[in-house]
From Swiss-Prot:
This is Ribosomal RNA large subunit methyltransferase H. The keyword Methyltransferase applies. Homodimer. HAMAP family: 23SrRNA_methyltr_H (MF_00658). Specifically methylates the pseudouridine at position 1915 (m3Psi1915) in 23S rRNA. It catalyses: pseudouridine(1915) in 23S rRNA + S-adenosyl-L-methionine = N(3)-methylpseudouridine(1915) in 23S rRNA + S-adenosyl-L-homocysteine + H(+). Its main location: cytoplasm. The lineage of its organism: Bacteria, Pseudomonadati, Pseudomonadota, Betaproteobacteria, Nitrosomonadales. S-adenosyl-L-methionine binds at residues 72, 103, 122-127. Its EC number is 2.1.1.177. It comes from Methylobacillus flagellatus (strain ATCC 51484 / DSM 6875 / VKM B-1610 / KT).
Length: 155
């Protein structure tokens, strides 16, 4: 199974890349993790936030293809680590690849949220883009450690 983290944004600082790499390299071989960066649309020439979101949504959906689509959104469902592990177990059993989407500065377009198979909230807080990437990478690793009975996660 492939986990694809699709992230709208610019090149991240070294600490973000280093932390994400640390968690993704710990993943088992059968869990391939790929980070796909989508260039953010510029708010030039009178483009409003919705037009920017819509253009980004099209590129995100192209990158996701037919994957199970998870959109990270502050209004999404909050879950515990064990609930996330159950979700991930279901993804693995389905045989589909999974794309997890982090929106740009203006967030995700409503059309993408409606197409998502699951809206997931890491937190109700607004967080820096890089921090979300790191938290997402860590939570995916933690969920897999629960599935594989690895001692990384403790209840």
């Amino acid at each position: 199974m492939k986990l694809r983290i699709i992230s709208v944004g610019h090149k991240m600082p070294d600490w973000v890349q280093s932390a994400c790499t640390e968690y993704t390299k710990r993943m088992p071989r059968e869990m391939n993790v790929e980070i796909v960066e989508i260039k953010p649309d510029k708010r030039a020439s009178g483009k409003n936030a919705e037009a920017v979101q819509e253009a980004e949504a099209k590129r995100i959906l192209e990158a996701a293809g037919r994957d199970y689509l998870v959109a990270l959104d502050e209004h999404g469902q909050e879950v515990t680590t064990l609930q996330l592990a159950d979700k991930m177990r279901g993804w693995m059993e389905s045989g589909r690849d999974v794309s997890l989407v982090i929106g740009g500065a203006d967030g995700l377009h409503d059309s993408l949220k409606h197409k998502a198979d699951w809206l997931w909230s890491l937190s109700k807080l607004t967080m820096p883009h890089g921090m979300v990437r790191v938290m997402l990478s860590e939570q995916l690793y933690r969920g897999l450690s629960v599935i594989n009975n690895h001692p990384y996660h403790r209840e």
